[in-house]
Amino acid sequence: MALVMLARAPAPPLLLPSPNPPPCALPQDLTSLVSPSEPPDPPDPPDYLVGASNSFLSILLLRSSDLGSDLVQALSPLDLGFALRSITAVCSSWYQVFPLACLELWFSIPHLSHPLVTLSKGFVSLKGSNFFEFFTFFWNMPSFILQFPHHEDVMISTSFRLVLPQYEAVMILLKLKLFLPHYEDVLFSIGLRIQLLLPQYEVGLILYKLRLLLPHYEDVIQKLWLRAIHVIVSLVWFLEISRRIKEKTYDVLTRNDLGSWTPDLFIEKWWFSQPHTSPKLRFFSHLVGSRSWCFVAYAIVAVFHDAFYPLEDVASPDSRSPSVLSYFRKLISCFSTIGVSNFSCLTVMYVFIFFFRAFRMPFVAVVSLAFVASLMYLLNHFSIVGE
């Protein structure tokens, strides 16, 4: 463990390494990068440091253990206008699980009230026990961002990093950088502040920060490529369904139109009441429902595929004795998971259309027979001239 504390003074002092630093003062990869020679002169302090209080402390804490847990906590009061003060990420083996419960986010927000939020020394600690709590918090994040219009980009990028802590490389490959337009700027500003504090350690800190962001880069790409796609697809599907329900609820409350509450997962209401509509409108009505069921099938296949990993570990704790689940998972892996999902999607779409077409035929027949029966009853029991 390495702990470096720098007290702010009227002129920023230079943090020099000890003449004979112990071998455990820094992690092994950083000791080889830091030179024992005299460091260069520090840069001139920025304008916003002039007149700042001397009571603040800038703390940089780096810790690395054999279990793979990494902790980086930077409390930098250099820019007092930023709402974001520090990010604390604590997790063991990021590349093995979906570590939402072991992440912690710190940012300075004066008026934030939420069950997951606790105040501590002017900062806010956000902790949760499951994915649903985190997802609910960040689903309502726009209402919190409205209080801080100047920091919305920083908070949005931080929330995406919390939801997907270990998929930065996957997000870049999936062209999802559009969701994080200021992601690089945030990292650059944090790295710049660290370099101003510790100019002689800037190379080692940058490399250590990159290792924290992408530990076991090759393993992530090889092992979690398909699982990351499944998680992202499930999130996108859930967001899309939630957005549709929210829009329909708004239509019901504003326009008082109960017909707009009909979910897209089912057929349109006019499809049954108007059996003589054109074939184009009927086919479009089929696709409206089958398209939504397609997303449901895709998410179910993704979750079903991911469920084999914990089941296999429980069924066969000894890797030398493969179980039936391992062979079945390898058989599924022989086929492309994306291809299986697309096939299931098409199957559900055509089954949906075929089912409702087959269901509509007896419905139309019953309506026609009822109409003919009522007409015959009227003709037999009532006279035209009123006799």
From Swiss-Prot:
Biased composition, class Pro residues, residue ranges: 10-25
Transmembrane segments annotated in the record for this chain: 97-117, 128-148, 154-174, 186-206, 221-241, 292-312, 335-355, 362-382
UniProt superkingdom: Eukaryota
Alphabetic keyword roster: Membrane, Transmembrane, Transmembrane helix
Localization of this protein: Membrane
Disordered as annotated region, ranges: 10-45
Example of a GO cellular component annotation carried by this entry: membrane
Topology versus the membrane: Multi-pass membrane protein
Record-given protein name: Putative transmembrane protein At3g54730
Organism: Arabidopsis thaliana (Mouse-ear cress)
Lineage per the UniProt record: Eukaryota, Viridiplantae, Streptophyta, Embryophyta, Tracheophyta
